[in-house]
Amino acid sequence: MSNQIFNLENKVVLITGATGIQGPEHVKAFKSVGAIVVATDIKDTEIILDVTSKDSIQTATKKIIEKYGQIDTLINNAGATGKYATDWEQIIKVNLTGTYNCSEIIGAMMKQGSIINVSSIYGLVGPDWSLYENANYDGKPMGVPAGYAASKGGVIALTKYFASLYAPKIRVNCVVPGGIFDNQPESFVKKYSTKTMLGRMANKNEVSGALLYLASDLSSYVTGANIVIDGGLTARV
């Protein structure tokens, strides 16, 4: 198979939440295959995009299209973390409503291409609470808020909805990562790692490959799909 199929040279890729845990790795990965990457976030990026504000999304999208002419791939990466957040409304607003807002507004301006959503294994399965016993991160108890699980399950449903709505011109898919190592407490990392078939948490750069696949012509017949990237955690009981 020709490497050219995986080539995203001069494709315009919009990434939300680009300064978060995984965002910088996604930016790096897409730049490595020749894409024009537009990294956005609520601060510290050239183009500011707040996924909870439709006005912000419209303003940012118009700037991008004026500069580059089009958007080929949208990556809905912005999210409220599930480490210890407890605010139901804010988590839903960012993770679920934010994904909806961007998919609706930016998708309507895309002529063709790919939308890739980012969910979580907690959108598929319930938490194993034993992992979080006596686990603290930045001085706060770790856990999985109900809003986080509900929002990520909703993202999976939205993926199928927009895949149906935008077919056949725009493909819409979802990646479903498991735990990403981010200097969590050693006790948590050890317990979590024993739950996976690969015996470890994911590195920050190990989700980006699936995004490249879903943005490229290698996945030209893939839409409405969820790619689970969890080291086999959800594949066994």
Task: Describe every region a protein language model picked out.
Residues 80-84, 116-167, 180:
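Catalytic loop of short-chain dehydrogenase/reductase
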Residues 77-82, 232:
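Conserved NAD(P)H cofactor-binding loop of Rossmann-fold oxidoreductase domains
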Residues 62, 94-113, 119-126, 160-168, ...:
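Amphipathic alpha-helical dimer-interface segment in Rossmann-like NAD(P)H-dependent oxidoreductases
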Residues 86-101, 116, 148-151, 155, ...:
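Catalytic Tyr-X3-Lys loop
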Residues 196-207, 218:
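A conserved structural motif in NAD(P)-dependent oxidoreductases
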